Amino acid sequence: MNSYGVILISYVGLIKLALAGILCYGIYLAIKSEKNLIKDALFVYKDNNFNVFGKKYALMIFLAFGFPIFFIGSFLYLFWEKLPEGFRFSLTFAITFFVLFIFGLLFVKYKIRVCKNGIYVGFRFITWKGFEGYKIENNKIILIGKKGVTYPVHLKYSKELEDIIKNYLKKI
């Protein structure tokens, strides 16, 4: 290997190191700002995504992931005996893991934090500007999202939570 190759490899290594450092610093800043958000929470309770985002959320996940798995699975069922044993095991394991992952998304309980700047649900932060208003239906406070910006968020009703939301959103 000549000296140009060594220099090129060294520069590529340094660039990769610099990019990794920038990425780590960005993650550090994100975690730091998230801790500040969580510290300023006005109201905290636990609920699962299925209750928070409603039936449309579950239907969206089913349509995005359930139908393709169903069609691929039914297609592979026709040729199941012709597939190699290792591939069948891997495919069965992957589908089982994926289905459990989807159930986890729907039914695992996440902390919901209502803050001064917005609402922190699971791993998403939605500012108050993303909502048009709120309404109360079936013992739930429904935060109505702006079209194309956010989706409606369903929160368990409590008087304290309603008083907090009333300061930031108008009742529709």
Swiss-Prot record:
GO terms for cellular component: plasma membrane. It comes from the Archaea. Keywords: Cell membrane, Membrane, Transmembrane, Transmembrane helix. The chain crosses the membrane at residues 7-27, 59-79, 89-109. It is found in: Cell membrane. It is a multi-pass membrane protein. To M.jannaschii MJ0695. This is Uncharacterized protein MJ0803. The lineage of its organism: Archaea, Methanobacteriati, Methanobacteriota, Methanomada group, Methanococci.
